């Protein structure tokens, strides 16, 4: 940013086309959030109608996470090859169809499959929308682009909670899913009315199509074994989360098998930069493990342990969702001011002060509970708005959509594990204590992984010849790229 423009308000650095691109992607992400959280709102109703156990009911939330890794890979590769816009539109259509299918589901298995479809669409929407907006905005505003965009998901959750309080008591839980068909109309409008991302257009102008992650894995030398491993991973995840396995050793073994498969895919597609990709998956895994027990099971906690009626539940969830949305925007400003990683760590540390009081206060004062949730979610969940910017900075434009989509959505399996883990712990403790304990302890793991820039640090330890020293999105240096105590002079920009 030149010195002549430093005193101009940030929003004046954006032209009409950039604002239109953001608005379209933000609305798409709002609809994504609306569709995705519906199952959490009606989980108790679905559990009662289908006669499910608590763990089975929680697995319906998990189902959408199980398929996300493949959706992120497939639709991310589409975004790298054919453009961010087409991938974004396709993703919206996919999760809308899955939501409609939930409304018609006759039982557990059908709804589980519909949730798998939603997960694929959600994964594609996350990767394509994030890269679309980030690559359309100026470099010095890209934390804001990321944070503002992800706020749409939280706003969608708030809207869903309000619609839930109006629709479900009158028409039942299935009517809520029928509303999910509306995003398809929006997707058709998007296809004709938004431009392609600037970075992608510049990178691909007059050039041959890039070799995507799908090309490497499913059209390359090892395509047969990779296809087999894909089916094995899908089957293993199915048995882990929907197969009612009671043996913890078998579940752990299947989880380890999936980890080996995903690491294999990362090594094949990323070459010498695989340590960075693997560490990014770990960052996202623990980010979901600390945040999603609350996201997924908060409605159940409010309805069962605090005995709130649907209207009160909707009001409390408004505070929670609105806090997360505000936090995404605040995180964008903090990220552009302090730097992405420093802003992330500071916000998470502040959120730790509030997590215990949220679940210790009980249900006697709804307004105090709502305010505590607002600030805790603003600091703890909202900062995840800049996670796409953080991850995307480790990938070049040619592989950013698939790289972001795959690493994020493999790590998002933590979101599949989180509600089940919370439900299992709640069998020994009350649900509120289980949620507070999980969130408080696992947040510190994320603080260490991001604060120490472990993706760059592990890359430097294992494959230093492929080390990237600067963020590919905003050109700022990675702190983990040089040994501690080396000083700023050690940062020499490299291309990789």
Curated annotation (Swiss-Prot):
Its domain of life? Bacteria
Entry keyword tRNA-binding: no
Specify one Pfam family.
MFS_1
Q: What is this protein called?
A: Sialic acid transporter NanT
Tell me what reaction this enzyme catalyses. N-acetylneuraminate(in) + H(+)(in) = N-acetylneuraminate(out) + H(+)(out)
Which Gene3D superfamilies does the UniProt record give? MFS general substrate transporter like domains (1.20.1250.20)
Name the membrane topology term: Multi-pass membrane protein
Say what the protein does. Catalyzes the proton-dependent transport of sialic acid.
Q: Which GO terms describe its cellular component?
A: plasma membrane
Oxidoreductase: is it a keyword of this entry?
no
Instruction: Specify the taxonomic lineage.
Output: Bacteria, Pseudomonadati, Pseudomonadota, Gammaproteobacteria, Enterobacterales
> Where is the protein found, in the record's own terms?
Cell inner membrane
Write out the transmembrane intervals: 22-42, 58-78, 86-106, 116-136, 148-168, 170-190, 224-244, 247-267, 278-298, 313-333, 353-373, 374-394, 406-426, 431-451
């Amino acid at each position: 940013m030149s010195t002549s423009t430093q005193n101009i308000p940030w929003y004046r650095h954006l032209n009409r086309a950039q604002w239109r691109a953001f608005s379209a992607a933000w609305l798409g992400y709002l609809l994504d959030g609306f569709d995705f959280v519906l199952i959490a709102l009606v989980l108790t109703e679905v559990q009662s109608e289908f006669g499910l156990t608590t763990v089975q009911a929680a697995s319906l939330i998990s189902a959408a996470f199980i398929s996300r890794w493949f959706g992120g890979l497939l639709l991310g590769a589409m975004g790298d090859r054919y453009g961010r816009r087409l991938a974004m539109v396709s993703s919206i259509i996919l999760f809308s169809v899955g939501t409609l299918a939930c409304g018609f589901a006759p039982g557990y298995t059908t709804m589980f499959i519909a949730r798998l479809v939603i997960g694929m669409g959600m994964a594609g929407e996350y990767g394509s929308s994030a890269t679309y907006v980030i690559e359309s905005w100026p470099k010095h505003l890209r934390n804001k682009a990321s944070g503002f965009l992800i706020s749409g998901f939280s706003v969608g959750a708030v809207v869903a909670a309000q619609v839930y309080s109006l629709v479900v008591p009158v028409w039942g839980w299935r009517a809520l899913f029928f509303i999910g068909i509306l995003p398809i109309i929006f997707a058709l409008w998007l296809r004709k009315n938004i431009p392609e991302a600037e970075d992608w257009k510049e990178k691909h102008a007059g050039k041959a199509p890039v070799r995507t992650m799908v090309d490497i894995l499913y059209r390359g030398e090892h395509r047969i074994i990779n296809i087999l491993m894909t089916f094995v991973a899908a089957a293993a995840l199915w048995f882990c989360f929907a197969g009612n396995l009671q043996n913890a050793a078998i579940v752990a073994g299947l989880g380890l098998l999936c980890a080996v498969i995903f690491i294999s895919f990362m090594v094949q597609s990323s070459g010498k930069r695989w340590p960075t990709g693997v560490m990014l998956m770990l960052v996202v895994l623990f980010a979901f493990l600390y945040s999603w027990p609350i996201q997924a099971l908060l409605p159940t906690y409010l309805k069962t342990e605090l005995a709130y009626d649907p209207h009160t539940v909707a009001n409390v969830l408004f505070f929670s969702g609105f806090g997360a949305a505000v936090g995404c925007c605040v995180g964008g400003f903090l990220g552009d001011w302090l730097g992405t990683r420093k802003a992330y760590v500071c916000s998470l540390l502040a959120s730790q002060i509030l997590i215990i009081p949220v679940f210790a206060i009980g249900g006697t004062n709804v307004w105090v509970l709502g305010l505590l949730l607002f600030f805790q979610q603003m600091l703890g969940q909202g900062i995840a708005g800049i996670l796409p910017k953080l991850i995307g900075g480790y990938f070049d434009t040619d592989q950013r959509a698939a790289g972001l989509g795959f690493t994020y959505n493999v790590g998002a399996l933590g979101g599949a594990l989180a509600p089940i883990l919370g439900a299992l712990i709640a069998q020994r403790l009350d649900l509120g204590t289980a949620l507070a304990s999980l969130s408080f302890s696992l947040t510190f793991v994320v603080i260490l992984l991001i604060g120490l820039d472990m993706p760059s640090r592990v890359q430097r330890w294992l494959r230093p010849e492929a080390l990237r020293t600067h963020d590919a999105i905003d050109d700022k240096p990675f702190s983990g790229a040089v040994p501690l105590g080396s000083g700023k002079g050690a940062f020499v920009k490299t291309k990789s």
